[in-house]
From Swiss-Prot:
Family, per entry: Belongs to the bacterial ribosomal protein bL12 family.
Coiled-coil annotated residue ranges, if any: none
Encoding gene, per UniProt annotation: rplL
Role description: Forms part of the ribosomal stalk which helps the ribosome interact with GTP-bound translation factors. Is thus essential for accurate translation.
Keywords: Acetylation, Ribonucleoprotein, Ribosomal protein
Protein name per Swiss-Prot or TrEMBL: Large ribosomal subunit protein bL12
Domain of life: Bacteria
Record-level Gene Ontology MF annotations: mRNA binding; structural constituent of ribosome
Length: 121
């Protein structure tokens, strides 16, 4: 007859703290693992799962309709005609940095409708 999981849990819950520590050490030696490493690995992915809140909008290329893209850049950034033209011609260039996801997506959509190639990072 084999021991069930419930029987093991009952036996461990009846042990003193020192006995549990010794049991853990014995299990680490027997199976060649470390309980501390398992805890650290389990905590790692949770930090990586944090959602990004600030995005950068990068103009990668102006496309065929450069005039429409310049107008869209002027409207989105408030730059003058010359500054917007210089920015579009120097692509790839950052249009806006540290904006919300909704603002970044809206800007990307308006620029792509004008014919530009845009990336949100």
């Amino acid at each position: 007859m084999s021991i069930t999981k419930d029987q093991i849990i009952e036996a461990v819950s009846a042990m003193s703290v020192m006995d549990v520590v010794e049991l853990i050490s014995a299990m680490e030696e027997k199976f060649g693992v470390s309980a501390a490493a398992a805890v650290a690995v389990a905590a790692g992915p949770a930090e990586a799962a944090e959602e990004k809140t600030e995005f950068d909008v990068i103009l990668k290329a102006a496309g065929a309709n450069k005039v429409a893209v310049i107008k869209a850049v002027r409207g989105a950034t408030g730059l003058g005609l010359k500054e917007a033209k210089d920015l579009v011609e120097s692509a790839p260039a950052a249009l806006k940095e540290g904006v919300s996801k909704d603002d970044a997506e809206a800007l990307k959509k308006s620029l792509e409708e004008a014919g530009a190639e845009v990336e949100v990072k």
